[in-house]
From Swiss-Prot:
Entry GO terms, CC: membrane
Residues passing through the membrane, by range: 29-46, 61-83
Organism whose genome encodes this protein: Mus musculus
Annotated ranges, domain HIG1: 1-94
Extracellular compartment segments: 47-60
Listed InterPro entries: Hypoxia_induced_domain (IPR007667), RCF1 (IPR050355)
Topology term for the membrane: Multi-pass membrane protein
Origin superkingdom: Eukaryota
Keywords, alphabetical: Membrane, Transmembrane, Transmembrane helix
UniProt-annotated location(s): Membrane
Ranges of the Cytoplasmic topological domain: 1-28, 84-98
Keyword DNA-binding: no
The name this protein goes by in its record: HIG1 domain family member 1B
Amino acid sequence: MSANKGWWVPPEGEDNLSKKFLRKTRESPLVPIGVAGCLVIAAYRIYRLKARGSTKLSIHLIHTRVAAQACAVGAIMLGAMYTMYRDYIKRVSEDAEK
């Protein structure tokens, strides 16, 4: 029987959560920016919930969701454009120099 039943330790070859997050951030840096943008927009819109005036709550929440999704989609599009630039334009210019 194990002494620490409630604790799970990853195998030696696997990364822990913080190392994996940092590695994924280096591979695609705009994903955390998109997530942070969604959280900031959602927090701001929920904070402004009191000052919504005569707008229904459901409409306010729908607008909040649309704004957060727009931020996430924008980050995804910027990430895709950066990846295309890195893989095609930058690589082609480096190959032409050699």
